[in-house]
From Swiss-Prot:
It comes from the Bacteria. It comes from Streptococcus gordonii (strain Challis / ATCC 35105 / BCRC 15272 / CH1 / DL1 / V288). The keyword Metal-binding does not apply. It is a multi-pass membrane protein. F-type ATPases have 2 components, CF(1) - the catalytic core - and CF(0) - the membrane proton channel. CF(1) has five subunits: alpha(3), beta(3), gamma(1), delta(1), epsilon(1). CF(0) has three main subunits: a(1), b(2) and c(9-12). The alpha and beta chains form an alternating ring which encloses part of the gamma chain. CF(1) is attached to CF(0) by a central stalk formed by the gamma and epsilon chains, while a peripheral stalk is formed by the delta and b chains. Belongs to the ATPase A chain family. Key component of the proton channel; it plays a direct role in the translocation of protons across the membrane. Its main location: membrane. Disulfide bonds: none annotated. This is ATP synthase subunit a.
Length: 237
């Protein structure tokens, strides 16, 4: 994917990437539309679209419950389910199309292929984990985990920063790399007519592989979020 200047808007000292905002909103709307469509006219005996929605929900619960614990699982199940669905959609948006203006502005990309978005999302997840930990355990008991034993305090603080950074960089590296190679294959197909069949075939295979990787990254991000959250609300017990 070649470098391009995305359209932006300036609000005071803050610059907003309009492409990133639009694609993030699109991902949210797609998730909402899917859940709304699948949950309409729900019955006690699920089938079809309702069955698919419940399967996805149970899937998320199954791989996160061990980290959160049965005591608090019902409080965070919808949060984790929504996070997983959003990431599945957001990770794959950039693979669906390649849209650029004549001046090279990229108008279609995965939100998670942007490091600023991933760092912001990771920061928000970290903040939620800390806030929920304090709310569930109390400030004094929560703070004690950082200073007991005393010689581990620097390592405990460093761990918070490494968790925050790794959560963002892991998903960014995988999604961005997928879009870069996909973009290069599209560019190759434009070089000459005889390159097109090769580029098309390779891009088809790579897109399928990237969809798989994107779903795996959504799984990993949600799993790690549940691990961090479970550790904060349950302590080291």
């Amino acid at each position: 994917m070649e470098e391009s200047v995305n359209p932006t808007i300036q609000l005071g000292p803050v610059t907003f990437n309009l492409t990133l905002l639009a694609m993030s909103l699109l991902a949210v709307l797609l998730v909402f539309a899917f859940v709304y469509w699948a949950s309409r006219k729900m019955t006690l005996k699920p089938s079809g679209k309702q069955n698919a929605l419940e399967y996805l929900y149970d899937f998320v619960i199954d791989f996160t419950k061990g980290n959160i614990g049965s005591k608090y699982m019902k409080n965070y199940s919808l949060f984790l389910f929504s996070l997983f669905l959003f990431l599945v959609v957001a990770n794959n948006l950039g693979l669906m199309a390649k849209l650029q203006t004549t001046s090279g502005e990229n108008l279609w990309t995965s939100p998670t292929a942007n490091i600023a978005f991933d760092l912001s999302m990771s920061f928000l997840i970290t903040l939620i984990c800390h806030v929920e930990g304090i709310r569930r355990r109390g400030f004094k008991k929560y703070l004690k985990a950082f200073v007991t034993p005393g010689f581990m305090t620097p390592m405990n603080i460093l761990e918070e920063f490494t968790n925050f950074a790794s959560l963002a960089l892991r998903i960014y590296g995988n999604i961005f790399a997928g879009e870069v190679l996909s973009g290069l294959l599209v560019t190759l197909s434009h070089q000459a007519v005889f390159y097109y069949p090769l580029a098309f075939g390779l891009n088809l295979v790579w897109t399928a592989f990237s969809v798989f990787i994107s779903c795996v990254q959504a799984y990993v991000f949600t799993m790690l979020t549940s691990m961090y959250l479970g550790k904060k609300i349950n302590g080291e017990e």
